[in-house]
Amino acid sequence: MSLFKYLRIKIFYTLMRPFSTLVRGARIRLFIKIMRPVHGTKILDLGGQPTIWDFVDIPLVITCVNLPGIAMIDHQTHHDITYVEGDACHLPNFKFGDFDIVFSNSVIEHVGNSGKQMQFAHEVMRLSNNYWIQTPCKEFPIEAHSGMPFWWYYPSWMRTYFLSQWSKKLPGWTEMVATTTVIQKRDLKTMLPNAQILTEWFIFPKSLIAYSVGNSPQGSERQPYKINAYR
């Protein structure tokens, strides 16, 4: 990979940081509005980092599940966070009722092929009636991982060419991009049939959010918000 291409990636992530912070903050505010966590709500965060919970003032009890060496365990926070190493597609040590809400932000597209994604979804539904699963939209002009415009619309040979060039300089990063499997709205609905599907907009469709509101952390019945999108 040329120095220019390497710098392009570094610059992309640097420029995206404030934008990502803005979008995640808005997304978490929507999460609070819809899911209504209270002080001490028990949340299972699949594949997440503690930094996203900095947007939430309410002290929560959070379990973050990640592959070994991924979680930022030294992050200082006002939440009660436990870090667990594990596979989000197979969590035999957890059972229904252990958590009030299952949460995941931009993870399901990284777990593997459609079969692995279905396993992920089954674990979500097995563990709670209340969940919030977000994944990027194919239609957003700038792909969130590679920084390439309209990445998912390139012919496969073109994506393969770019990946082969990138892998010479950044093999780990390239593997992450190469193994990302974008999810369409209809597929997300198939995986999580009881969910409401929310489209997050930033001029273009930015991401999809599948959420279900079954029982509140206090145990009372709640009805889901009738929201199709926010801008």
Predicted regions and their residues:
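Active-site rim elements
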Residues: 15-21, 171-179
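Conserved S-adenosyl-L-methionine
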Residues: 194-205
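Flexible, glycine-/basic-rich loop-and-beta segments that form/coincide
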Residues: 218-231
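Short, glycine-/aromatic-enriched active-site segment of Class I SAM-dependent methyltransferases
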Residues: 149, 162-175
